[in-house]
Amino acid sequence: MEKIENLKWKDVTFESIEIDPDAGVVLVSVEKFSSEVENLVSLLEKETRFRVIVNGAQKSNGDLKGKILSLLNGNVPYIKDVVFEGNRLILKVLGDFARDRIASKLRSTKKQLDELLPPGTEIMFEVVEPPEDLLKKEVPQPEKREEPKGEELKIEDENHIFGQKPRKIVFTPSKIFEYNKKTSVKGKVFKIEKIEGKKTVLLIYLTDGEDSLICKVFNDVEKVEGKISLGDVIVATGDLLLENGEPTLYVKGITKLPEAKRMDNSPVKRVELHAHTKFSDQDAITDVNEYVKRAKEWGFPAVALTDHGNVQAIPYFYDAAKEAGIKPIFGIEAYLVSDVEPVIRNLSYDSSFENATFVVLDFETTGLDPQVDEIIEIGAVKIQDGQIVDEYHTLIKPSREISRRSSEITGITQEMLENKRSIEEVLPEFLGFLENSIIVAHNANFDYRFLRLWIKKVMGLDWERPYIDTLALAKSLLKMRSYSLDSVVEKLGLGPFRHHRALDDARVTAQVFLRFVEMMKKIGITKLSEIENLKDTIDYTALKPFHCTILVQNKKGLKNLYKLVSDSYIKYFYGVPRILKSALIENREGLLVGSACISGELGRAALEGASDSELEEIAKFYDYIEVMPLDVIAEDEEDLDRERLKEVYRRLYRIAKKLNKFVVMTGDVHFLDPEDARGRAALLAPQGNRNFENQPALYLRTTEEMLEKAMEIFEDEEIAREVVIENPNRIADMIEEVQPLEKKLHPPIIENADEIVRSLTMKRAYEIYGDPLPEIVQKRVERELNAIINHGYAVLYLIAQELVQKSMSDGYVVGSRGSVGSSLVANLLGITEVNPLPPHYRCPECKYFKVVEDDRYGAGYDLPDKKCPVCGAPLRKDGHDIPFETFMGFEGDKVPDIDLNFSGEYQERAHRFVEELFGKDHVYRAGTINTIAEKSAVGYVRSYEEKTGKKLRKAEMERLVSMITGVKRTTGQHPGGLMIIPKDKEVYDFTPIQYPANDRNAGVFTTHFAYETIHDDLVKIDALGHDDPTFIKMLKDLTGIDPMTIPMDDPDTLAIFSSVKPLGVDPVELESDVGTYGIPEFGTEFVRGMLVETRPKSFAELVRISGLSHGTDVWLNNARDWINLGYAKLSDVISCRDDIMNFLIHKGMEPSLAFKIMENVRKGKGITEEMESEMRKLKVPEWFIESCKRIKYLFPKAHAVAYVSMAFRIAYFKVHYPLQFYAAYFTIKGDQFDPVLVLKGKEAIKRRLRELKAMTGKDVQKKNEESVLEVVLEMILRGFSFLPPDIFKSDAKKFLIEGNSLRIPFNKLPGLGDSVAESIVRAREEKPFTSVEDLMKRTKVNKNHIELMRSLGVLGSLPETEQFTLF
């Protein structure tokens, strides 16, 4: 600590200034606070980045205390006093509750507080005992809680990392409570962030699972870096300060502790058979890899994956489990709907409707569970021969008072029941009314089970009768969104009634039943036994799904599961993906079916009063029965308490044992650890889940923890061991280890593909280079063909070749993407125009060939023109020097990724062509999975804050955000990716399928798995839509010039990449001295800046600029610096990945090592020490080595060449056919073209451009508007003009050339759009417009459009109305 005393500055005398560099704090003492002091504080904080605390500084405003009390308004009763001591504001508060409440208020009013208090003021709390009268007030009081207690730790010296050692008492983030004290805080590290600046600061985020804290390391960063990692438990010691309204620890010492992990210490481990991951749609936060890692740490032999409704995590789960050496069990928690349930039950005889007696009944009860709830009202109506002949009604006094909730639902009060008969008195009488009738009810299971159970309780009878459910009848006979009794009554037009009173409900249900009888008779159903035929017509969307666990037993089972999942998304999706019970029965081979949670069919039936015989019948369907810890139900669950759940589980155990079924205890895992519950709460908060904050204990449990929970239920150690350890392991042993994907390519089959590719390649090679081929060509072609054919990739080349040829024959050029241009075979087959050979001359006549080994020429297009020394014909120039390895790996075994850019207009036709080639059921769009991004996760956590009223610390918010980030939101599709299934396989051999984002109107199916996970098994063809080929097609149509024939060394075209001279415009007025506005890849402000700095003079340099602009950390903070410092020229720096391999091989490096270095660098992995050493041995320049270290991503040269080739062709038309260029540009890229502004002239355009350029944070529309106006201004400066839309001349969508002007199309009129524009042209082609009235009558034009057209002169001399004359 450095100290300076009695320092005078301006008019201020400083008693002392103390500097603590370890804490990054400056303590200043002054006699009186003033504006000069405030200015000095700001200056010091800005220049030093230290925190400045002013001791003794108090604003002169004597009313400061009053203003603070005013700010705290409603909290004033809890404040005993406000005291200023030096730089401290001490709030003396009445009790712990007051402290917490006021601290929360201070955080929410931080901005106002900062304006009131002098800089550096520390806020302290002093808790005093509240007076008796305050405690008696009707205000929320906390439970009396003790001052947070720290723990004493024994610290080993070898664990100490640096600085001060921990204090005797150590706190955790949720227990800290005093500021400005030397404090030690223990927690788990969940984030480490390094902030670079004048001073480097390391932020360490600690948590104890309840709260989190930011710890700042200032001057000892190098002592900490690399010494602690995520997941470590540390003790950080330092000054605990209030910073930005929340506690922050300024670290002066760190000690690492051995982590006290939850571990599974059971000698025999359990198996988890029910777990959800982040792929369960916005419901779970378990990371797949962390789940498997934990299972491995605990020694579990196997674990299952059962996400809600999908299996998208399977590929990731398998890879993680395989690496961990544990058995992966694939599964799903399905949304099962029982489409096989009977409409009429217990029917033991047959009868016509007329000869049967029906009793339609309804009960009002105290709750939903017949085991514990009671009947309080009976209403019943008897029907004979289609007529209502009798009624029964009574209220019943229950054994205990009814709840307020029951009264609210039923309208029955306790007073109404006081003098009524008991159920024991009523039931015998009601049974007499029922006689031998068939019972009818709406949602009949509910009423029937209550009646049967209470007959058993009261009379000891095992009573069963046939019963019909009008709910099931409604789902068979009506099409509705809701089948509640109210909705059905309304649908049938039966008038209003008083719902939730038993007799009223029974009467109206009787009317509903009689109407249904009429409807059944009309479709030929006249007997009771025939009612069952209706179940085949039940709408699956009307059936309520229940949970069901399905596990994959073998490969056949996996395929069957994929089929079921596919149908659930494609055929039966309604709110959730539904699996029909009938479909599961049909595809059950290789699957094990579990009863799932208490929301499953079996659990639900048990809670709704099903008899043992009913439960046995339901349980027979399942291979195993699940029970779960009682605390997987939230503590305040209204409809189910834990004692009742215990009874249900014991009953299910007895039934399962009787049926010889396994009973297993599962965890219904949704997060890994108990402390993660808040993360799931934050995930559910914005989703309308009313009980989100009270999270059940859905964490992964150890064997001991699960045994303890089993004992709570069964109170028997043998049963506990059976359900926790033995049975789950037995099920795991029944399951084979299945590999979902083979990680080897299954290409589609095209007969003789190998021979065709070889034949086409050689034929074209001979045509271009002659027979015999030059040695360099022969070797390259043979090497590539051998790699392509031997690894089974010929079919990929053939598909791409056919696609490109089809597009070209239809008049649309195709651009290549990625590294396909690295392949000479691809070039010879016409897949790409990029020739990867070294720069060379070739003669089209006599086949003379010569490679030019001259470092001045990086591209064949740059070679000087020459005539053939043999025959005198002009030589062709080509070659871009791209190694094949960048495409298919050093061994030529990497799956070739052929990406093609089709015209946006042609893309759909290209996709249809692929479908025709292989069959629609063998071509699917490449699926994607969209997850919650970090920014969106912040929104979830903010919603959690708002709904709970809990202000979170920044560190705790970071913790929750990290848990939510990556949770699946929805699905989508790759913009052009097509996955091809070989003809000898089904798609279900690889993946389920679905609609993208579950949109039935999408018209296409996607792979259920994200395409990246199946990329190694299936061929993916990228047929993307792009503007540039459309641009080229329109230019070709406008000029009649084939763009593939233009000279790629045209000097004027090349010149616009470094000046505006060929355009003939003033660079000052254009505000650019390069002419690339509107040129793809070169028109952006960033790339134009690169062009200005580098002034490229060759095609090869344009390729370098393209590579530099598409890489990450390749130009800025890298190549640009080496050029400016004079270490290298543009032609020397690393611009594309291929540059590294070529340069190192040129230096004499062994090619395989050069390839490895290139691969490392392009992926942002830098270079190893061994690689660096080898580079230095070959005298590779230091700047080159440093450049490799800085690069995060490198663009492939082949991709850059393809982009530049397309751009150069478009630029050629801009220079030599300007109006055609501008017509095409504004037609295709002019979405933000504003005719109203443009027609005002040059000065108005310049003004708007200045406004746009001055804007910060422009959205996409504003950026596009700026780009369009730049091209508009350039066109005008070149001497051309725009003509307003004309009702007689304009096209719907295209800019038309008229003399030296462009006629604006109709769709550029604001608010008009393509549809209206096309209607105008269509009507005009039928016959000319005769009036405005005629125009509006025959088109989609409205009054607002007409007003705009009038203002711009679009209507010309068109009269307003029809004019008729006799002569």
Swiss-Prot record:
SUPFAM superfamilies: AF1531-like, Ribonuclease H-like
Gene: polC
NCBIfam families in alphabetical order: dnaq, polC_Gram_pos, PRK00448.1
Record-level GO BP terms: DNA-templated DNA replication
Function: Required for replicative DNA synthesis. This DNA polymerase also exhibits 3' to 5' exonuclease activity.
Catalytic reaction annotation: DNA(n) + a 2'-deoxyribonucleoside 5'-triphosphate = DNA(n+1) + diphosphate
Family the entry assigns: Belongs to the DNA polymerase type-C family. PolC subfamily.
Assigned GO CC terms: cytoplasm
Domain of life: Bacteria
InterPro entries: DNA_pol3_alpha_NTPase_dom (IPR011708), DNA_pol3_finger (IPR040982), DnaE2/DnaE/PolC (IPR004805), DNAPol_HHH (IPR029460), DnaQ (IPR006054), Exonuclease_RNaseT/DNA_pol3 (IPR013520), NA-bd_OB-fold (IPR012340), NA-bd_OB_tRNA (IPR004365)
Keywords: Cytoplasm, DNA replication, DNA-directed DNA polymerase, Exonuclease, Hydrolase, Nuclease, Nucleotidyltransferase, Transferase
Domain (Exonuclease) ranges: 358-513
Subcellular compartments: Cytoplasm
This protein's name: DNA polymerase III PolC-type
GO terms assigned for molecular function: 3'-5' exonuclease activity; DNA binding; DNA-directed DNA polymerase activity
EC number assigned by the record: 2.7.7.7
